[in-house]
Protein backbone atom coordinates (compact mmCIF):
# COMPACT_ATOMS: atom_id res chain seq x y z
CA UNK A 1 0.00 0.00 0.00
CA UNK A 2 1.44 3.33 -1.04
CA UNK A 3 0.45 6.63 0.55
CA UNK A 4 1.32 9.69 -1.47
CA UNK A 5 -0.05 12.78 0.24
CA UNK A 6 -1.99 12.91 3.45
CA UNK A 7 -4.07 16.01 4.10
CA UNK A 8 -6.73 15.81 6.77
CA UNK A 9 -10.02 17.56 6.40
CA UNK A 10 -11.22 19.99 9.03
CA UNK A 11 -13.34 17.57 11.09
CA UNK A 12 -13.42 19.24 14.51
CA UNK A 13 -16.55 20.42 16.31
CA UNK A 14 -18.33 22.99 14.17
CA UNK A 15 -15.74 22.76 11.39
CA UNK A 16 -16.66 22.46 7.74
CA UNK A 17 -15.36 18.94 7.05
CA UNK A 18 -13.63 20.19 3.90
CA UNK A 19 -10.10 20.18 2.54
CA UNK A 20 -10.14 24.00 2.57
CA UNK A 21 -10.72 26.08 5.68
CA UNK A 22 -13.21 28.92 5.55
CA UNK A 23 -10.54 31.64 5.67
CA UNK A 24 -7.22 32.70 7.10
CA UNK A 25 -6.81 35.63 9.49
CA UNK A 26 -3.55 37.56 9.11
CA UNK A 27 -3.34 40.34 11.70
CA UNK A 28 -1.93 43.68 10.59
CA UNK A 29 -1.68 45.25 14.04
CA UNK A 30 1.16 45.20 16.54
CA UNK A 31 -0.77 43.47 19.30
CA UNK A 32 -1.60 40.38 17.25
CA UNK A 33 1.22 40.38 14.67
CA UNK A 34 4.86 39.62 15.44
CA UNK A 35 6.14 40.56 11.99
CA UNK A 36 4.11 43.28 10.30
CA UNK A 37 6.56 43.54 7.41
CA UNK A 38 6.21 39.84 6.50
CA UNK A 39 2.41 40.00 6.85
CA UNK A 40 2.31 43.00 4.50
CA UNK A 41 4.64 41.19 2.09
CA UNK A 42 2.24 38.23 2.16
CA UNK A 43 -0.67 40.51 1.30
CA UNK A 44 1.30 41.82 -1.66
CA UNK A 45 2.31 38.30 -2.75
CA UNK A 46 -1.23 36.97 -2.55
CA UNK A 47 -2.75 39.83 -4.51
CA UNK A 48 0.07 39.79 -7.08
CA UNK A 49 -1.04 36.19 -7.72
CA UNK A 50 -4.68 37.29 -8.12
CA UNK A 51 -5.81 36.04 -4.71
CA UNK A 52 -8.52 38.28 -3.32
CA UNK A 53 -7.98 39.52 0.22
CA UNK A 54 -10.26 41.57 2.41
CA UNK A 55 -9.55 43.93 5.26
CA UNK A 56 -11.99 44.16 8.14
CA UNK A 57 -13.80 47.44 8.68
CA UNK A 58 -14.77 46.68 12.28
CA UNK A 59 -13.33 44.79 15.22
CA UNK A 60 -14.26 41.10 15.53
CA UNK A 61 -13.47 38.27 17.91
CA UNK A 62 -12.40 34.76 16.97
CA UNK A 63 -11.46 32.05 19.45
CA UNK A 64 -11.37 34.58 22.28
CA UNK A 65 -8.98 36.98 20.51
CA UNK A 66 -10.14 40.47 19.52
CA UNK A 67 -8.88 41.59 16.12
CA UNK A 68 -9.15 45.29 15.23
CA UNK A 69 -10.46 46.86 12.07
CA UNK A 70 -7.72 46.55 9.46
CA UNK A 71 -7.12 42.81 9.89
CA UNK A 72 -6.47 40.89 6.66
CA UNK A 73 -8.86 38.06 5.82
CA UNK A 74 -8.06 35.58 3.06
CA UNK A 75 -11.36 33.85 2.18
CA UNK A 76 -11.46 30.45 0.52
CA UNK A 77 -14.62 31.33 -1.41
CA UNK A 78 -12.76 32.45 -4.54
CA UNK A 79 -11.28 31.12 -7.77
CA UNK A 80 -7.68 31.35 -6.51
CA UNK A 81 -8.30 29.55 -3.22
CA UNK A 82 -5.83 26.81 -4.13
CA UNK A 83 -3.09 29.40 -4.61
CA UNK A 84 -3.86 30.95 -1.22
CA UNK A 85 -4.29 27.63 0.55
CA UNK A 86 -1.12 26.21 -1.00
CA UNK A 87 0.88 29.09 0.46
CA UNK A 88 -0.86 29.34 3.82
CA UNK A 89 -1.95 25.92 5.05
CA UNK A 90 0.15 24.12 7.61
CA UNK A 91 1.88 21.63 5.35
CA UNK A 92 1.64 18.31 3.59
CA UNK A 93 3.03 14.99 4.71
CA UNK A 94 4.59 13.26 1.70
CA UNK A 95 5.74 9.79 2.65
CA UNK A 96 5.42 7.80 -0.59
CA UNK A 97 8.62 8.97 -2.26
CA UNK A 98 11.96 8.07 -0.79
CA UNK A 99 13.76 10.82 -2.69
CA UNK A 100 12.37 14.18 -3.69
CA UNK A 101 14.08 16.71 -5.91
CA UNK A 102 12.91 19.48 -3.64
CA UNK A 103 10.56 20.04 -0.76
CA UNK A 104 7.31 21.81 -1.39
CA UNK A 105 7.06 25.16 0.37
CA UNK A 106 3.94 25.70 2.39
CA UNK A 107 3.30 27.31 5.73
CA UNK A 108 4.59 30.67 4.56
CA UNK A 109 3.65 32.07 7.95
CA UNK A 110 6.21 29.76 9.53
CA UNK A 111 8.93 30.26 6.92
CA UNK A 112 8.46 34.03 6.74
CA UNK A 113 7.67 34.55 10.41
CA UNK A 114 4.23 36.17 10.54
CA UNK A 115 1.25 35.30 12.72
CA UNK A 116 -1.80 33.74 11.11
CA UNK A 117 -4.91 31.89 12.25
CA UNK A 118 -6.87 29.28 10.30
CA UNK A 119 -10.67 29.46 10.55
CA UNK A 120 -12.54 26.27 9.60
CA UNK A 121 -15.92 26.99 11.24
CA UNK A 122 -18.62 28.27 8.84
CA UNK A 123 -20.42 30.13 11.66
CA UNK A 124 -17.24 32.00 12.60
CA UNK A 125 -16.53 32.85 8.98
CA UNK A 126 -20.03 34.23 8.56
CA UNK A 127 -19.47 36.73 11.39
CA UNK A 128 -15.94 37.58 10.18
CA UNK A 129 -16.99 38.14 6.57
CA UNK A 130 -19.80 40.42 7.76
CA UNK A 131 -17.21 42.98 8.94
CA UNK A 132 -15.01 42.80 5.81
CA UNK A 133 -14.67 45.48 3.19
CA UNK A 134 -14.57 44.77 -0.53
CA UNK A 135 -11.96 42.41 -1.93
CA UNK A 136 -8.64 44.06 -2.72
CA UNK A 137 -6.66 43.63 -5.90
CA UNK A 138 -2.89 44.09 -6.11
CA UNK A 139 -2.99 47.87 -6.56
CA UNK A 140 -5.32 48.21 -3.56
CA UNK A 141 -3.01 46.02 -1.48
CA UNK A 142 0.08 48.04 -2.44
CA UNK A 143 -1.64 51.25 -1.38
CA UNK A 144 -2.86 49.66 1.85
CA UNK A 145 0.50 48.21 2.87
CA UNK A 146 2.31 51.45 2.01
CA UNK A 147 0.14 53.19 4.60
CA UNK A 148 1.00 50.68 7.37
CA UNK A 149 3.37 52.13 9.93
CA UNK A 150 5.23 50.91 12.95
CA UNK A 151 4.24 52.08 16.37
CA UNK A 152 5.56 52.18 19.88
CA UNK A 153 3.90 51.03 23.06
CA UNK A 154 5.62 51.47 26.36
CA UNK A 155 7.32 54.16 28.37
CA UNK A 156 9.30 56.82 26.52
CA UNK A 157 12.92 57.36 27.56
CA UNK A 158 13.13 53.85 29.03
CA UNK A 159 14.80 50.70 27.80
CA UNK A 160 13.00 49.14 24.84
CA UNK A 161 13.17 45.58 23.56
CA UNK A 162 13.10 45.26 19.78
CA UNK A 163 12.33 41.71 18.69
CA UNK A 164 14.55 40.48 15.89
CA UNK A 165 11.51 39.62 13.81
CA UNK A 166 12.05 41.34 10.48
CA UNK A 167 14.33 43.31 8.23
CA UNK A 168 12.71 46.47 9.60
CA UNK A 169 13.64 45.59 13.19
CA UNK A 170 17.23 44.98 12.12
CA UNK A 171 17.26 48.29 10.22
CA UNK A 172 15.96 50.07 13.33
CA UNK A 173 18.85 48.69 15.41
CA UNK A 174 21.31 49.76 12.70
CA UNK A 175 19.87 53.29 12.71
CA UNK A 176 20.23 53.46 16.49
CA UNK A 177 23.86 52.37 16.24
CA UNK A 178 24.56 54.92 13.48
CA UNK A 179 23.08 57.61 15.73
CA UNK A 180 25.48 56.64 18.51
CA UNK A 181 22.83 55.13 20.78
CA UNK A 182 23.61 52.30 23.15
CA UNK A 183 22.23 48.98 21.98
CA UNK A 184 22.48 45.75 23.92
CA UNK A 185 21.30 42.20 23.48
CA UNK A 186 19.13 40.17 25.83
CA UNK A 187 20.71 36.72 26.09
CA UNK A 188 18.45 35.12 28.69
CA UNK A 189 15.19 35.60 30.54
Q: What function would you assign to each model-found segment?
A:
Residues 1-3, 7-189:
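Intrinsic-disorder/low-complexity accessory segments
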Amino acid sequence: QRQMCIRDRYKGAGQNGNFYPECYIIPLDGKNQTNLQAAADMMEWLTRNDVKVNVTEKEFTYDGVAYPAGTMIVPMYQAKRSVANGALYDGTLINGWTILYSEGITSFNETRGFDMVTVAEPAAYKSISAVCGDAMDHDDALAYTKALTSYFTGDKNKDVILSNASEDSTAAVNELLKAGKTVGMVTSG
